Amino acid sequence: MQIPFSSSSSTSLGIEWELQLVDQQSRELRGEASGILHELRAKVGECEAAKAKHELFESTIEVITGVCDSVEEATADLSGTVSLLRDLAERRGIGLMCSGTHPASDYMGQRITEDHRYFRLVSQMQWLARRLLIFGVHVHVGVRSADKAMPIVNALMAYVPHFLALSASSPYWLGGDTGLASSRSQVFASLPTAGLPYPLEDWPGFESFMETLIVSGTIETIREVWWDIRPHPNFGTVELRVCDGLPSLMEVGAVAALAQCLVDRMNTQIDRGYRLPTPQRWLVQENKWRAARYGLDAQIIVDGRGGIRPVRDDITDLVEDLLPVAHRLGCSSELSDTLTILRTGASYIRQRDAARRAGGDLTRVVDTLLEEMNTGRPVVDG
């Protein structure tokens, strides 16, 4: 089975941001995506409205950038679409926010979007699909050829805990504290074609594996492979999907810059004849769990002998190493914002702080998330 790969500029960038529609009175999710998207099409036309689309549940809208040359361009693109949606949503008494999970809303009360693909997913996966009331950020970075795609996917697995720790924003599930930094990552990993990618050596290996999945009836299309990192042949990108939903535009820009810099450096290394390393899968699996459980306080395994290091320190050193790349790509400020996240705390920390100050009232958590979406920056109260 041949899967054409669309060549893409190595610095091109695209971002997908899954937003929650929240009732401003009850602070619970409200399923009104269809109405809002219909009004958006009427207001700006089909072309511009294509930057916002349905997801599995009617209480979610995904915002999508075009193909961008820089992080600054991508975040500006997102901001423009979010602004349009916010105006339409607020007329209905709905606010926009983002986090890996809603702190309290129950998945059993959510309406599924009327789409054959979603109905088929729920029919096949049943409870696993019905509880997918989770929200993420996906970052696409351009890759010049299919030959580079799988080596870059494999090498990026080493950074799964870094992205997850920075973005972790789902400590609550159905109104209770899970004890995790990212419960979303554990909910999503329950799907049989989600989680860590298989370390396939090259593009023919990827094509062969996809053919096996389709012939066996495991999937209908390769779009149904929801790995934490995957190649996207149609876009000519590598797509990082591991991140929890990020509440503020600043944080979205930070993880996008980190992704763009890493992929760009790997592109260059391949061009220079360097063979990218593929980390051992058991090590990545364990480090992903540690990031999901402990977030920025995780101690990740850094070698096959069991040596460990604080993920905070690894992120700090990684950012320093990538600053020359970021300077060339024009995203030094956004990359440095990853260090701001280390100082202020990732969203799971801020959410727990907000709940603690409110005596456990999770509506205060929702209010904080709504504010962060509106201001574009993390809210840190003393």
UniProtKB/Swiss-Prot annotation:
It catalyses: L-cysteine + L-glutamate + ATP = gamma-L-glutamyl-L-cysteine + ADP + phosphate + H(+). It is an enzyme of class 6 (ligase). Keywords: ATP-binding, Ligase, Nucleotide-binding. It holds the Pfam family GCS2. SUPFAM superfamilies: Glutamine synthetase/guanido kinase. GO terms for molecular function: ATP binding; glutamate-cysteine ligase activity. GO terms for biological process: modified amino acid biosynthetic process. Its EC number is 6.3.2.2. The keyword Transmembrane does not apply. PANTHER family: GLUTAMATE--CYSTEINE LIGASE 2-RELATED. Belongs to the glutamate--cysteine ligase type 2 family. YbdK subfamily. HAMAP family: Glu_cys_ligase_2. ATP-dependent carboxylate-amine ligase which exhibits weak glutamate--cysteine ligase activity. This is Putative glutamate--cysteine ligase 2-1. It comes from Frankia casuarinae (strain DSM 45818 / CECT 9043 / HFP020203 / CcI3).
